[in-house]
Amino acid sequence: MTMAKKIYFNNPQRLTQLIGANTTVIVAGRRTGKTDSIAAPFALRNMQRMPGSTGGIVVPTFKHGLTNTLPGLLAAWKRWGYIHGVHYVVGRRPPKSFARPIIEPNDYEHVISFYNGSCAVIISQDRPGSSNSLTLSWLLVDEAKFIDYQKLKDETLPANGGIKSHFGRHSFNHSIMILSDMPQTQKGSWFLHYRDKMDPELIATIEGTVYEIWRTKERIRSLSSKRQPVPDYLKGYLRRLDRNLNQMRSVAVYYKEYSSIENLQLLGENYIKQMKRDLTPLTFQTSILCQRIGIAKDGFYSSMRE
């Protein structure tokens, strides 16, 4: 019998996964595990549960994607038992044993291909037209403060139309995740407005529904372990909860800001002290503490001068 492997997630990482909003924007300090434990589960879930789909990973440059984003994703997947060359391949045509994507890429050079036919295309803004002709079912936008929003809006967001006939029932079809630390310029602040789009009551209802599903499953497990019959009404109640959760997630926007201190258990106090010592006050406040400082139109912080 295979033993389940326990995986540690901090509170921001757990909440992001449990809420599972169709649009998720996480603004968090350095070393909070944005790529490793927020982006990696998001991409893996989409590729596993929408077999044959195509997703997009938007990065400022291919160099950034290949040296920062991609290694973080692959390292997390490896820890969770997904092996490069067995469960997925990168940058080459997948083996014949893999299922084929619903829409096959023209070129596999910047593509992650999964065994079930899902693939993720690395979309770099330093190469014009890298979103052209794509039909995407999800988008991951990494290092969003360096992303040109006009290019994203004109070239990439329209591609996130997905294939409704295959994946329309999933709340995460057309989903988008945006990750960054706190920007220091007006141009890099394009994603902060998502805070105003979030409905706190809807998010609270999702949290309550997730808990109620867990509580109901525990009750069913308890009855089964005692070899007692599980009432039909309880099974029906669980199905209704799942349907309601799926509907709420499909329209939800989740926006959160976190400082690096949220990951203190792994980072340790010395890391925070070292960053305070080594970074400029402005960079420490934005990149570690994730604090918003008023940004003037010229791109400089209006309430602070270094």
What annotation goes with each model-predicted range?
Residues 2-21:
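Pre-Walker A adenine-sensing motif
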Residues 62-64, 127, 182-186, 262-265:
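Conserved nucleotide-binding/hydrolysis micro-motifs of P-loop NTPases
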Residues 225-239, 247-251, 257-306:
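ATPase catalytic-site recognition across NTP-hydrolyzing enzymes
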Residues 141-250, 257-260:
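Signature of the SF2 helicase/ATPase Hel1-core->accessory helical subdomain module
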Residues 32-33, 65, 131, 147-150, ...:
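Catalytic P-loop NTPase motifs of RecA-like helicase/translocase cores
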Residues 66-135:
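Inter-Walker segment of RecA-like/P-loop motor cores
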Residues 24-93:
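Conserved P-loop
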Residues 41, 68-76, 151-159, 190-194, ...:
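Alpha-helical scaffold elements adjacent to nucleotide-binding pockets in ATP/GTP-utilizing enzyme cores
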